[in-house]
Regions:
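Final/C-terminal transmembrane alpha-helix of multipass membrane proteins
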Residues: 301-322
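"…together with the soluble PPM/PP2C metallo-phosphatase catalytic core" -> "…together
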Residues: 2-263, 319
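Short, strongly hydrophobic alpha-helical membrane anchors
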Residues: 1-2, 326
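Membrane-proximal soluble regions of multi-pass membrane proteins
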Residues: 30-33, 260-307
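Short, charged low-complexity intrinsically disordered segments located at boundaries
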Residues: 271, 323-324
């Protein structure tokens, strides 16, 4: 019956997001500010948020009706799911605030960096606090060839740094049609499979619902895009990739699952570090992030989408290898 609940969640996520995308695309187009007429509207991530939330609710309800023991307190499945959902929505809310600032104040950069980082850190801290209060916060992570490494009191600091860094990295990736959502779709499939291998199959309802929603969103987001996720969508997806593995005690899965985003954000970080260290006289790359670098090398949007898909598949393979070895 859990398998049926996952099918329900993914199907409902697809249907709801497809319907919402059809309704919201003309509405969001009317709110565009400082954009060219041929540019697609942003903030499409709202479709993902609403569709995923509803699909998870229905899917988890179906699972609990079929197997009431899922509501037991031994493994705190419902608690872990709710905390993960809360974290995902918190990061999505930060992205929504970022997008609204761009619209209302006509600021192409959105929220100021210190404000955005503070909001992301606050969201991550809330998630960690809730996990800690419910005795669900992991104190280490499993490393291939090394085993489980305990971080002790440094664990919350490391988890918070990962959550914030991932949110910033995903934010930089929203510039090429389909790349953010395509990579996230593959990551959700990998996360759902890894959770099954690790014994958290019931909680796969969240990545299943999000995978269905992403499949529908790609109907509008694939090149040539009619709708983009915006900061709200990117932060929402970053929250899912960070909070779901953390809530089931496997935060290390975030590292390979989000491989394309780490490459995007890491490239920007290195560019900034080298530029500041040289006093603004030197750049490590011709341009950053990775999708802009590929674009400058002559790759068209479809080929860039495929390259990011290959990177996401590599991350998926590394994730499954780590899950099997644990």
């Amino acid at each position: 019956m859990i398998r049926f609940a996952l099918i329900v969640a993914s199907t409902l996520g697809f249907v709801l997001t497809a319907a919402l995308g059809n309704l919201m695309t003309p509405l969001l187009r009317a709110f565009r500010v400082r954009q060219e007429e041929n540019e697609p509207p942003t903030m499409g991530g709202l479709c993902l948020m609403v569709g995923t939330l509803a699909a998870v609710g229905v899917g988890w309800t179906a699972a609990c009706v079929a197997q009431p023991e899922l509501l037991g307190t031994e493994s705190l499945l419902t608690t872990r799911l709710l905390i993960a959902l809360f974290g995902v929505l918190c990061f999505g809310a930060v992205g929504l605030a970022d997008d609204l600032v761009r619209l209302r104040h006509r600021s192409p950069l959105g929220l100021r960096r210190p404000v955005r980082l503070a909001l992301e850190a606050a969201s991550g801290t809330l998630v960690l606090a809730l996990l800690g209060l419910n005795h669900c916060l992991p104190d280490g992570l499993a490393l291939p060839g090394v085993g489980y490494c305990t971080l002790g009191p440094l664990a919350p600091v490391v988890w918070l740094a990962i959550l914030v860094a991932l949110a910033e990295s995903a934010r930089t990736a929203d510039g090429m049609d389909g790349t953010v959502c395509g990579c996230a779709f593959i990551a959700m499939l990998g996360l759902m499979t890894a959770m099954t291998l690790l014994g958290w199959f019931p909680l796969g309802v969240l990545p299943a619902a999000l995978a269905g929603a992403l499949m529908a969103f790609l109907l509008w987001n694939f090149y040539p895009a009619k709708l983009r996720p915006g900061a709200v969508g990117c932060q929402f997806l970053a929250g899912a990739l960070g909070c779901v593995p953390l809530s089931v005690g496997w935060p290390g899965l975030t590292l390979p699952l989000a491989l394309p985003y780490w490459l995007e954000g890491g490239m920007v970080a290195l560019q900034i570090i080298v530029w500041k260290a040289s006093g603004g006289r030197r750049q490590l790359f011709g341009t950053a992030p990775l999708h802009r670098w590929l674009e400058k090398r002559g790759f068209d949007p479809v080929n860039i989408f495929y390259i990011f898909g290959v990177l996401a598949m590599l991350g998926l393979a590394l994730t499954l290898q780590a899950a099997r070895a644990s």
